Amino acid sequence: MAVVLVTVVPLGTATPSVSQYVAGVERVLRDSGLKHELTGMGTIIEGDLDAILSVIRKMHEQPFSQGVLRVSTSIRIDDRRDKKGSIEGKIRSVREKLGD
C-alpha cells in the first residue's frame, strides 16, 4: 500500500486565497473513496498506487474547471513493498520513539 502526499496549487488566481480551489480538489478526492487526510499544506492519501495516481490526475484538473489557467501539483510517494504502511502507522512509529 502506498502513502502519498499531494499538493495542488492554483497559480495566477484573482486573490491570494485559494481555499475555494482546495475545496474543489478535496471534493474530487472525497468522491474517490480513498482514505486521506487533509492538512494545512497538502493532502495525504493511502491506498493502491494506481488508484491514487488516477485520482491525483483528476485533482490536478479540478482548478482548471474553475477557471484557473495554471496549476502546479507536487507529489511525494512512499511505496513500501516489504510491509503494509499507513498514515497512522507512520505517526504511531514516531510517537513511540518519542515516548508519547
Walk through the language-model features, giving the residues of each.
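Charge-rich, low-complexity N-terminal segments
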Residues: 1-100
